[in-house]
Amino acid sequence: MKENQKQHQVFIEGAGLSFTISENDTILGGILRSGVGIPYECNAGGCGSCKYTLIEGDVVDDFEGSAGLRSSDKRKNKHLACVSRPQSNCVIQINPDAQYAAKTHPKRVNATLQSVEKLTHDLWEFYFQSDHSARFLPGQYAKLGLPGVAGPRSYSMCNNANNDGRWGFQ
């Protein structure tokens, strides 16, 4: 996390839980990194599984036209945790559930693009090198922020976990 990013406290009403996140991080990212479990699937605003009610505070929704949020939800001050970012301290209402707690907590990793290969007319494979081991479980994916691309996008890892810091994606 960059030092110049504003930090905000997010309180989960009724659960006695809170966490601190950057205003550039999503509510879902903060929830998962804090070890709290909530239902979520797409992590991109399409499914609506991570819906919460904003009780106090201000958030920015990165995907206003999200299929996961109806106009009736918006009138009830509902937002999607995966595409909303805090702009102040917030109080939210969501139902934590231990069955959804992450086995590994998401973390930010900086890496350098090492190679790109076109596999088919619409499939590319690319590898990054980081200073940290590439530890992940089957089925996990990474949200990558790439220069020139609006917003992060989810990519599946295509290599095996390793201690060399090599991350492959398709």
Segments the model singles out, each with a brief description of its role:
Residues 15-18, 88, 132, 149-151:
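Short acidic/polar mixed-charge low-complexity motifs
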Residues 97-105:
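Intrinsically disordered, low-complexity Ser/Thr-rich linker and spacer segments
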Residues 30-39, 49-98:
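Iron-sulfur (Fe-S) cluster-binding segments and ferredoxin-like electron-carrier domains
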Residues 1-39:
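N-terminal pre-ligand scaffold of iron-sulfur
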Residues 105-170:
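Ferredoxin-reductase
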Residues 11-14, 54, 146-148:
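Short acidic, glycine-rich loop/turn motifs
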